[in-house]
Amino acid sequence: MKFKRLATIFSAVLVLSGCGSMHSSGKDLNISLPLKTKSIAPYETDVPVKIGAAESLFKTNDQGKIEKALVKSYHQPNDTTLDIELKDNIKFQNGQKLTAEKVKSSLENSMKKSDLVKYSLPISSITAKGQKLTIKTNSAYPELVSELANPFMAIYDTDAKSDVNQTPVGTGPYQIKDYKQSRKISLSNFKDYWQGKPKLDHITVTYQEDGNNRVRNLESQKDDLITDVPVNKVQDIENNQNLKVSKESGFRTSLLMYNHTNKKMTKSVREALDHIIDRQGIADHIYQGYAKPATSPFNDKIPYIKEPKLTKQNIEQAKMLLAKDGYTKEHPLKIKLITYDGRPELSKIAQVLQSDAKKANIEIDIKSVDDIEGYLKDRSAWDATMYSFGTIPRGDTGYFFNQAYKKDGAINKGDYNNSNVDDLINQLNHTVDVKERHNISNDIIKLSSRDVPNSYIAYNDQIVAANSKVKNYKVTPEGIYLIDYRTTIER
């Protein structure tokens, strides 16, 4: 009897261990991202779109063109009206059908909750009936379709019982099941996804600010896929036969952002700092060739941008400019410069700036923070900051100009303001002709550059690394999309 009981227990252990093996060999993917976010509401972060949890009405394809996503057809009968018909076979992850009324509620709630969305969508009214949606704007707004492709305009069910900040319910192939703030997101596949059954069973996303730690987690197989790979680790990953690197010349620009509310950050000071930056050296040595020196906010791969001449490092010119404001070797300018580890190259740039600035009679105090977005809200706490963002995510300059140069723009952290630049941006917003939009864009670049609103340093490549068993993830210039229903891992 005793032996029978032991045999039964042993059999049970085998069954349980077998079940464990089956689970571990399932299609589970572990992803590591930088840049913590306190909320994962779609209007607060692009993470839900990046990881396949939410979708916008439109999307950007691999060539940077806007195409339909949740939309069956659309028509613009005049400059202020957009008629949309939604696809009829799409469900939210809670089983509710995607209807025009659901989209209306989502967009209106996002505009109410987010300044970025509100100022990107100058909408006067939305009417909904069945699968048909009519959006009217306050005035001519030719880039409305492009803005509706913005991941911050992703559609979610406002009637869902869950908290949109914790577990938003979207239409993507993977449903967010649990969110531990600034630490981890757990997702499961949505079997009724409209494009087909997702290839993965589960996805776990963790936030890891330190780029070197992200690489270590990939090498140890703790993670399967990581973004924003530090350039000094690319060669190590390429030398590992179990890993692979994917690169794409990107639309992300690294920059030195100035606090225009601070009296010491005068135009002379901003010009001096602009002359201190060795853009070519930074691109060659800090980015190790995975970036190009910047001459404006926009990557020079954009064909219609007339790139200004590259500003070369000139320490003597910087000293002369600073002398105008009374700064000398005996009385140096003291600046507090903020940086963060989510993009490790930025901290290295800060250190180079600190060293070079000393030659021009500037003492830079570097402070590294965890929550860069939260920290910059207090403008009394900083003079300048390292920063990085996608300046032209959908092929048009309007997004950047409205968000970075308008006074109430969501990424105008330093409160830059020029009424003449504002007038040109307003003109751009109401201009339909594509060639004329390009001309106005170049006029804005030329006029604003006289103010030195920020110092643009480098255009960064998008660098993603993965276990060689991971297939069909996306690496795109704008860095928005990563996971879709075809992404899989071979176990």
From Swiss-Prot:
Subcellular location(s) per record: Cell membrane
Alphabetized GO MF terms: peptide transmembrane transporter activity
Induction of synthesis: Induced in response to decrease in pH and as a function of growth phase.
Lipidation (S-diacylglycerol cysteine): C19
Top-level taxonomic group: Bacteria
InterPro entries for the chain: NikA, Peptide/Ni-bd, SBP_5, SBP_5_dom
GO terms classed as biological process: nickel cation transport; peptide transport
Signal peptide per UniProt: 1-18
Disrupted gene: phenotype observed: Deletion of the gene strongly reduces nickel transport and urease activity. Mutant shows decreased virulence in a mouse model of ascending UTI. Nickel accumulation and urease activity are almost completely abolished in a nixA-nikA double mutant.
N-palmitoyl cysteine lipid sites: C19
One Pfam family matching this protein: SBP_bac_5
Keywords (A to Z) from UniProt: Cell membrane, Ion transport, Lipoprotein, Membrane, Nickel, Nickel transport, Palmitate, Signal, Transport
Membrane topology, as annotated: Lipid-anchor
A single Gene Ontology CC term: periplasmic space
PROSITE patterns assigned to the protein according to its UniProt record, in alphabetical order: PROKAR_LIPOPROTEIN
Coiled coil location: none
Family classification: Belongs to the bacterial solute-binding protein 5 family.
Function per UniProt: Part of the ABC transporter complex NikABCDE (Opp2) involved in nickel import. Binds nickel and transfers it to the membrane-bound permease. Required for full urease activity and plays a significant role in the virulence of S.aureus during urinary tract infection (UTI). May bind nickel via a nickel-chelator.
Subunit structure: The complex is composed of two ATP-binding proteins (NikD and NikE), two transmembrane proteins (NikB and NikC) and a solute-binding protein (NikA).
Protein name as it appears in the record: Nickel-binding protein NikA
Lineage: Bacteria, Bacillati, Bacillota, Bacilli, Bacillales
Gene name tied to this protein: nikA
